[in-house]
């Protein structure tokens, strides 16, 4: 099982970014995203609508105390992975990861305690990179694409144009 924590969501600044973090997590097989910062029902509804149409399972949940959540997930047996440009190469460590992974991605400046709580601080390239692209690359490497049996809509790949099939 893979779950995500998006730190420090800010409604005005991060609406699209947090939505894209959630959609990337869903597309690459995560089952849930938690987010901290400002509670944002519009962002939650946007992600839930995509999940309803294109399939799941995938959940969105707001958390006030993300430190307690990280500790709880570790007690439940998850490996806490903090994606940061300052970490070790994720390619060198990906085979050390357990089946249940709790991935932490930043928003605003990440507190030092996150680096201490994480079982792994991993980098995608040791360069400044968006949380969306870093998460996507990481999840693709460890999990590949997700598949969704309960979708109402499926994208039919096309050489040109767009085609959706409704069920």
Annotate each language-model stretch with its function.
Residues 87-124:
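Long, charge-patterned amphipathic alpha-helical coiled-coil/hairpin "stalk" segments used as oligomerization
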Residues 9-11, 108-111, 126-129:
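Short acidic/polar capping segments at secondary-structure boundaries
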Residues 1-84, 135, 139, 143-148, ...:
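RNA substrate-binding interface of SAM-dependent RNA methyltransferases
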Residues 94, 152, 166:
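Phosphate-binding and hydrolysis-coupling loops of NTP-dependent motor/remodeling domains
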Residues 115-162:
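Structured adenosyl-cofactor binding patch, chiefly the S-adenosyl-L-methionine
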Residues 43-44, 67-70, 89-91, 111-112, ...:
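Short, well-ordered alpha-helical microsegments
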């Amino acid at each position: 099982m893979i779950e995500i924590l998006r730190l420090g969501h800010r409604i005005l600044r991060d609406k699209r970014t947090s939505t894209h973090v959630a959609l990337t997590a869903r597309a690459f097989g995560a089952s849930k995203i938690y987010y901290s910062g400002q509670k944002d029902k519009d962002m939650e509804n946007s992600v839930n609508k995509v999940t309803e149409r294109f399939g799941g399972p995938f959940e969105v949940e707001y958390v006030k105390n993300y430190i307690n959540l990280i500790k709880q997930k570790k007690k439940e047996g998850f490996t806490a992975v903090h994606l940061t440009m300052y970490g070790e190469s994720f390619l060198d460590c990906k085979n050390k990861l357990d089946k249940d992974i709790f991935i932490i991605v930043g928003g605003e400046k990440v507190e030092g305690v996150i680096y201490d709580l994480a079982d792994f601080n991993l980098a995608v390239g040791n360069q400044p990179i968006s949380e969306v692209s870093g998460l996507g690359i990481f999840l693709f490497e460890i999990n590949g694409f997700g598949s969704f049996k309960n979708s109402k809509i499926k994208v039919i790949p096309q050489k040109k144009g767009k085609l959706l099939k409704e069920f």
